[in-house]
Amino acid sequence: MITGDENLRVLVTGGAGFIGRSLVKELLANNFTVSVIDTVSSSDKNAQSLIQLGARYHNGDIRDSSSVEQAGSGCSHIVHLAAQTSVPASIENPELNDDINLRGTKNIINYANSNNIEKVVFASSAAVYGDCEDVPLVEESAGDCRSPYAESKFQCEQDLLSLMPKETQVHILRFFNVYGPGQDANSNYAAVIPSFIQRITSGQSPTIFGDGSQSRDFIAVSDVVNLITQILSNHNNPQNGVYNVATQTETSINELLRIIT
């Protein structure tokens, strides 16, 4: 167990989401003081589970600067998970995608600048690599964005790295295909796994697009959460950093199906 500093108060944006819930629970278990901002109603079961564990919960939108200020009051660190995460939705409505991701992140930056935030951890995405065929992917290969979602994530990275005060540590984490307990089959994080499980348990055959030879790098949400917790706890982090959050192990869709069944 990582022992947190009880005086270290963390604002988790998107804390009621798939990764956010696991992170908030881990932080609370390690004695961090946690504040959450999410558009999910405080009466929702996911929000209630966090409230019952001791999180300060704020039903708000990161696009509203006053909501960010209220949720972040007294916090020294920020984990910015809140985002529009659907690639198809970003193509269908790029303006909304940018409004949530870009304007929301600008509000986080403004809040950090005005409140002496020590450290910001940002959830980016492997989507910023586009169709780059270099394996393994290196952080410097990013920028070949193929969707408004990817473009917005890459722009958020640039904004965070360029607009934060030098005293604030910025850690950009490019998540690959995150999976784990509590994942919705309709989610945007490696949804193939819960989709397979859902169809199998309901007596249906899993749907495979193509010949199933396409591969992905899957990483457990527990590993993602442990990494973020360590970054928050470590006072010797480098000033800024951009990191791939993956396992460097490729698993084909066919192999994944064999593992699940």
Cite the ranges covered by each PLM segment.
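Conserved mid-core alpha-helix of short-chain dehydrogenase/reductase
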Residues: 67, 107-110, 159, 218, ...
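NAD(P)H-binding glycine-rich loop region in Rossmannoid oxidoreductase-like domains
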Residues: 62-99
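Catalytic helix-loop patch of NAD(P)-dependent Rossmann-fold dehydrogenases
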Residues: 92-110, 114, 118-119, 128-179, ...
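Rossmann-fold scaffold of SDR-type NAD(P)-dependent oxidoreductases
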Residues: 13, 75-81, 122, 244
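Hydrophobic "lid"/C-terminal helical patch
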Residues: 23, 160, 228-232, 257-260
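N-terminal Rossmann/SDR dinucleotide-binding element
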Residues: 2-77
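Glycine/proline-rich active-site loop of Rossmann-fold NAD(P)-dependent oxidoreductases
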Residues: 154, 178-194, 202-205, 209, ...
